[in-house]
Amino acid sequence: MTESIDEIRIERAQGIGFIALNRPKALNALSTPMLHAIHRALNAWRDDASVHAVVIYSPHPRAFCAGGDIRFLYQSAKAGEHAVIEEFFTDEYRLNHAIFTFPKPYIALLNGVVMGGGMGISQGARHTGGVRVVTGSTKMAMPETRIGLFPDVGVSWFLARTPGAIGRYLAATGATIDAADALYAGLADAYMDDDALPALIDTLKEKPFATGAEVVRFIETQARSLGGTASELEKERGFIDKHFATGNGAACLKSLESVTGGEESDWAARTAAELRERSPLSVDVSLELIDRAKSSSMAETLRRDLGLTRATFDHGDVMEGIRARIVDKDNQPVWKVARMEDVTRDAVVRMYDNPWAERDHPLAALAD
């Protein structure tokens, strides 16, 4: 199968399916045609015995994928096209689940920006027996609380399985992490230098492979150690666990703002300032999301994400967040609840109300 649209190129070579993201001006932000093209390819390759593995990558150095097409979703909502928004997220989450349950190694090469929807089309690789490769340029994040959203695309399932309170910390703050952090947190599996990726892809297209496991082993032989590069998350782990292990956003803030003196004080002050810039409602929704994901399947996680997405557009902060951060860029969002301390438990629980009967949920058929 070979398919080309302006935003993506899909081809096969030497028993491997290749998906190249090609929307560089938008940092490969996912459009509906891109979602559909990737899903069609996976459906075609799933039961094709001549395809042993899948590699998804970006030929552009700045970004693997910066997320979903947020401007498109904002414009659709402003136009009252709510069905378009729901269709986009439903299609995206179906794709995330198809990757998570793909029966062959799925390999993601994660250079540059890897955020939001980019995490959704890459994190499932580990579950398939594949590998997530990060590089020196990797900038990984789920920054959704900055725009009044939450860490969707099933990523709460992965964040809930990171060491200690790292998942809650990343979900609430939207902090950007590098390759060393991603490896420490279990959000990546191997490291390669950026300038080694083009040669790796060329070799994968030329070298014959008999099995998917053979493809993975070959990639692992090309990976290298980060050597003495330390993970900031690892160094800050004690602080993170102390302040983010339990409680809502207000409790985390109170804990951070109670610190006085020393190295922890500087870190706590920076982190508290970051939290104060986020949507208070989204922070609490995101912390709750990680807690719930700990005991959920991926299918349950994605069904929950879809309900939350509708709630955030209906009565959450996402429209104001996108306006302030991305459209007008005044960086002065007026959140529905101004202070973290004023978010009520009822407001958080309301966001989790399921708008569908169980059998009518658009993702009812998903099963891990």
Identify what each model region corresponds to.
Residues 1-57, 97, 366-368:
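Conserved CoA-thioester-binding segment of acyl-CoA-metabolizing enzymes
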Residues 193-275:
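Amphipathic alpha-helical blocks and their helix-capping loop/short-beta junctions
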Residues 308, 316, 320-368:
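C-terminal amphipathic alpha-helical interaction region
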Residues 154, 161-214:
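Contiguous mid-protein beta-loop-alpha structural module that forms a pocket-lining wall or clamp
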Residues 56, 69, 121-122, 181-182, ...:
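Hydrophobic/aromatic residues within transmembrane alpha-helices
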Residues 253-262, 267-307, 311-317:
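Substrate-recognition/cap regions that form aromatic- and gly/pro-loop-enriched pockets
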Residues 99-147, 169-179, 190:
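Glycine-rich beta-to-alpha active-site loop
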Residues 58-94, 146-148, 351:
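Glycine- (often His-adjacent) and acidic-residue-rich active-site loop
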